[in-house]
Amino acid sequence: EDINLKYNSKVWTIHPSDIDFRYKVKEATNKALSYTRTAKKLENLKRKSKLILNERHHIALEATYDKDKLDVIIDCIAQQIDREALSATLAIENDGSFKKLPSKDGKELQKDEIKKEIDDIIKNKNIMDLNLPVKTTIPKLKTEDVESVNSILGQFSTAFNNETSRGSNIHVAGESSSDIIIMPQETYSYNNATGPRVLSKGYKYAPVIVGGKYINGEGGGVCQVSTTIYNAALLAGLEIVEVHNHTYLSHYVSGGRDATVAYGYYDLKFKNPYSHPIYIKNIVGDGAITTKIYGCKDDIKRIYVRTEYEYKKQKIIVKTYRVYLDQNNQKIKEELISTNKYDQK
């Protein structure tokens, strides 16, 4: 008997021959013949007596089929049903305009579940039509998530000399660490965003600090990009997970506001603490880089950053605080973000 599998208006029919379906007639016959042929004579006499007295002994007629062939059939059906969930897309242009495309739910045939149902009806000799169990899969980024990104939570700019190899590196790093969506409770990693800053990725040799000395190294200048992103993250109220200061004070930002990076060693990481996604946007122009962090307008905070300097013989110690204000610009709370120690030149 055929097994019909249904989903919406489609029907897939499994014929017995498709899966080598058969009843184990020979096995059942052998069991019947051996019922009174055990190794124990007394037991054989008892069983024969019961049969003579019309006491029936039931021997189940079992069914069997090729599970590998069923797997192939179910896989083929899944290929016709399954559809990958598509996340909504979001792109923010340099002029602040939004480009959004809606998400699409996916479909996934629950293969193990339908194979078990088929196995059950075959074993129970209760062949019937079955509705295919299909699960709706949800994309990571839904339409409503994208729609919630509508405002700037924080932004920051720094200036640089565009006519240098260092300036070229800022352009490359700025592009690779931009246009990234961070979901709620996810952590942004600058090193993960840019990958290794090496020549094969378009970086050039430029001054870097190694062991307290300036030398030419691959990707010199990328710390200005991480620093710009860091300050935007501070003003956006994001949770700072990892940040490191330079050996010396930087020329492009005040003390306690820098974020040095070294691939495989030092990273800039921050977490999205909100219930809506955020979007990291870098705009690298001629002589300036601006980071804008977009999110839901409900998550906008009034924030400013302040620093405290302490000068010692060979060190400059700078404490960085983030201050939250209410609608009347009155301080709600203040948190220490980092304590930074710089060598004096």
Model-found features: residue ranges?
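Signal peptide-directed extracytoplasmic domains
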Residues: 3-106
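Well-ordered beta-sheet/strand-loop patches within structured domains
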Residues: 72, 76, 84-93, 105-106, ...
